């Protein structure tokens, strides 16, 4: 893999989760453009720089030791990549601490560097949280590859920060440079809420939660077919989002024990709040993580999963395949993984490579619900 070579540092970076024969590198031309733009300013070492949505540490590690860096984002995997890449490049793994997007920012900041996320609601929430956190003379610079840069990103910067100047494109990347101006305090539209009839619950959704405006159609197809009569089983909601699968299952299985895990900190925050609202003081483990990577082997009886098919702008079934492998490792012999997936993704054949038996529980014209027994 090529090195990230900028005026600040030369870095050897890896993506997360790691894959054999990884076809993608851990940085892109937008990272290079941002770093070169900052280098041209010859900023003193005491400059306070906030990095938002750094994929795997490309920006924060490059700047470490050159300015005072804080880094925040909504991805557990990105922070895992930050730690591993710090070590890989001769720095202490805790030289930089990733601040989850669910936690407040503490400024003031002289420069803010933003990688524009796939979910613009996350960008909007982050810009709102910058209110009162920018030092006099601050600059906010957002970057993306041109093909992933919607006009709405510039509109959000202008609404919440100030006038925006778009750079020329360099290596198919572009910068949006915002000059802060006095603004009336903005009220965040997040979290959003919606109600379900069956089960009768209200679900809260922070900005980066998948389908935060309403239940996605895959989950809607899955809910009537969740397993019942689980007794005191150990159940995991893998990639839990706002926690709806675990909550619906728990309402039907009062003695079961639940673990909810997602790599999005905002999803985990939403799931924890929704669990408390629906189930009160009933205990559950709700955590951010790399799926079931930290789960003890053969410690679960049931895994529920609506697997994702993208990581930011990267589309593919590699995350789903990894989740299936993790579920197999975590399940007891005889335990079962229940999933919902688009018909065209062919999950049945993939699961058959890992599990003793795979059966179709239900189907709609678009989705299948599958049960895979270890």
From Swiss-Prot:
Cell compartment(s), UniProt: Cytoplasm
A Pfam family assignment: MTS
GO CC term, one of those recorded: cytoplasm
Gene3D superfamilies for the chain: Vaccinia Virus protein VP39 (3.40.50.150)
Highest taxon of the lineage: Bacteria
Keyword line: Cytoplasm, Methyltransferase, rRNA processing, S-adenosyl-L-methionine, Transferase
GO molecular function terms listed in the Swiss-Prot or TrEMBL record: 23S rRNA (guanine(1835)-N(2))-methyltransferase activity; nucleic acid binding
Enzyme Commission number, as recorded: 2.1.1.174
Reaction catalysed by this enzyme: guanosine(1835) in 23S rRNA + S-adenosyl-L-methionine = N(2)-methylguanosine(1835) in 23S rRNA + S-adenosyl-L-homocysteine + H(+)
Top EC class for this record: transferase
Keyword S-adenosyl-L-methionine: yes
Functional summary from the UniProt entry: Specifically methylates the guanine in position 1835 (m2G1835) of 23S rRNA.
Alphabetical list of PANTHER family matching this protein: RIBOSOMAL RNA LARGE SUBUNIT METHYLTRANSFERASE G, RIBOSOMAL RNA SMALL SUBUNIT METHYLTRANSFERASE C
Similarity annotation: Belongs to the methyltransferase superfamily. RlmG family.
Protein name: Ribosomal RNA large subunit methyltransferase G
Species of the source: Pseudomonas fluorescens (strain Pf0-1)
Lineage of the species this protein comes from: Bacteria, Pseudomonadati, Pseudomonadota, Gammaproteobacteria, Pseudomonadales
